[in-house]
Structure formats: C-alpha cells, structure tokens
Amino acid sequence: MAPKAVLVGPPGAGKSTIGRRLAQALDLPLFDTDVAVEEEAGRTIAEIFVQEGEPAFRALEEEIVRKAIESHEGIVSLGGGSILSERTRELLKGHTVIYLEISVAEGLKRTGTNTARPLLAGGDPRQKYTELMRKRRPLYRQVASIRIRTDGRSPARVVQQLVAKLAE
C-alpha cells in the first residue's frame, strides 16, 4: 500500500485545504498528519511545543508520518516541518510528493499572526517565515516529484491542475 500522493509545503501553502479537496476530487481518503499528531497526543501542536518542546513533537510527528506513508492509500498531507527529518525524507523516496510552493509574502498573508503555528509565534513574522523558508525550501524541492505554486490561485484551480498532473 502506498499513498496516491503526499503533500508538502510551508505553513499557509494550503496542504490541509488542497489535501481535502484533492482527496474529494479523486474519491480517496485524506490523512492529515497534523490532525493525527493532535489526536495521538490529545493536545494541540502548540501545546506539545510548549509542554514538551519541538524535539518531542518532531519524534511523534516522524512516527505518524511513517505509519501514514506505509499504510495509507489516499492523500497524505504532511506538517510543514516534517521534511526536516532525514528519516521522513527517506520514506518519501519513490512516492508522488507534491510540493505546494508559496512566496513568503503570500505565506505571511495566509498565516498572519496565527498562534497555533508555534514556529511563527512571537518576534517579527516576516523574519521568522523567511528564515523558515530558507531552511526548508531546499528540502521541499529535494523530496518533490511535482511542484505547483499556490500563490494567487484558488484551491479549486490548484486541485484541477493536480488532478491533471496525477493522471499523466
């Protein structure tokens, strides 16, 4: 068993929204790893970060991603930082991985000052998002077999393009 596609990208790129719509368009189930992490922990991601720290969160996330990649047959939406794990990047090899690309400006517009996103909380949001992208963009590109920009595009348009690409 393997997922039809795995979505990756930074906060605000549309992984959850596009994931839901893509799964619906393809009549497949969606597995959102952020939702699964929260269900497994019984807490929000922000609470895990505060109470246990990022390393504990990443360990739990890595295990949930592994299970999803190994057993889910639909669409898998990964948390934005999941690609920081070398183990996760290895697991993604050979799978259809869709990188939802977004500019820093658009990402900031979409995420705003969302405190549910612990890595963007506090300080200068533009600086934090820019630094996050500097570190992660090469990793997203490394794992991606399909790249699609989501800036200025409706979710419906992005899904339409992805359905066509997945049919190729």
Curated annotation (Swiss-Prot):
InterPro entries: P-loop_NTPase, Shikimate/glucono_kinase, Shikimate_kinase/TSH1, Shikimate_kinase_CS. It catalyses: shikimate + ATP = 3-phosphoshikimate + ADP + H(+). Mg(2+) binds at S16. It is found in: Cytoplasm. One of its GO terms (cellular component) is cytosol. Its main location: cytoplasm. Belongs to the shikimate kinase family. This is Shikimate kinase. It comes from Rhodococcus jostii (strain RHA1). The gene is aroK.
